[in-house]
């Protein structure tokens, strides 16, 4: 099963457990948040990977677990339980921001925006043309914006020598998820 199909299944099951379907609009905020989180718990670890010892990421930022950066120092070690807690807290911040910033965006667009915010930072999303287009309901144009975010620390991640090939793969996945309509 593809990653997107697993995400759709996670969203569908979460909504069904709350008595809703994926075709419903105006979901209650807690239900929508739970559905977005369910998809991200599938998507984000697949893109980030999980490492229990601190390491400098491609951009030189000290990172641990599944992309957690806040307060990480060389030599830090985390348990699987700590990593899970970091992931849920960090994803929750991204989801809460996206739900406030783009409340009218379709569900899967919010999932893609939240993963993007998790990856590049809420501030970067807040200043982006991507978010402005999403808020304006210009979803085809917004989806094209993911392709503009291919650089890490000034290096073009489309170039194999720059050791960040996962970024173009992730941006294409985000673009595809952004456009999912069920």
Report each predicted region and the residues it spans.
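Short, surface-exposed glycine/acidic/tryptophan-bearing loops
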Residues: 52-78, 108-110, 114, 130
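Active-site nucleophile-His-acid catalytic modules used for acyl/amide transfer and hydrolysis
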Residues: 93-128
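Structural recognition of the beta-strand scaffold that forms the well-ordered cores
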Residues: 43, 63-65, 112-115, 141-145
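Short glycine/serine/threonine-biased micro-segments
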Residues: 47, 58, 63-65, 119, ...
């Amino acid at each position: 099963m593809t990653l997107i199909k697993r995400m759709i299944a996670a969203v569908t099951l979460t909504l069904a457990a709350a008595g809703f379907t994926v075709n419903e609009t105006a979901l209650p905020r807690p239900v929508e948040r739970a559905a977005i989180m369910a998809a991200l718990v599938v998507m984000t670890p697949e893109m980030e990977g999980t490492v229990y010892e601190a390491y400098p990421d491609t951009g030189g930022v000290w990172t641990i677990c599944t992309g957690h950066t806040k307060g990480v120092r060389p030599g830090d070690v985390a348990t699987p339980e700590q990593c899970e807690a970091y992931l849920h807290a960090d994803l929750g911040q991204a989801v809460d921001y996206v739900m406030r910033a783009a409340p009218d965006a379709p569900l899967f667009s919010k999932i893609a925006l939240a993963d993007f915010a998790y990856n590049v930072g809420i501030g970067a999303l807040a200043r982006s043309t991507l978010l402005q287009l999403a808020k304006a309901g210009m979803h085809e144009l917004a989806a094209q914006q993911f392709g503009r975010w291919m650089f890490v620390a000034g290096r073009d991640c489309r170039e194999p020598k720059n050791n960040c090939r996962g970024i173009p793969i992730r941006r294409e996945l985000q673009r595809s998820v952004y456009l999912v309509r069920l």
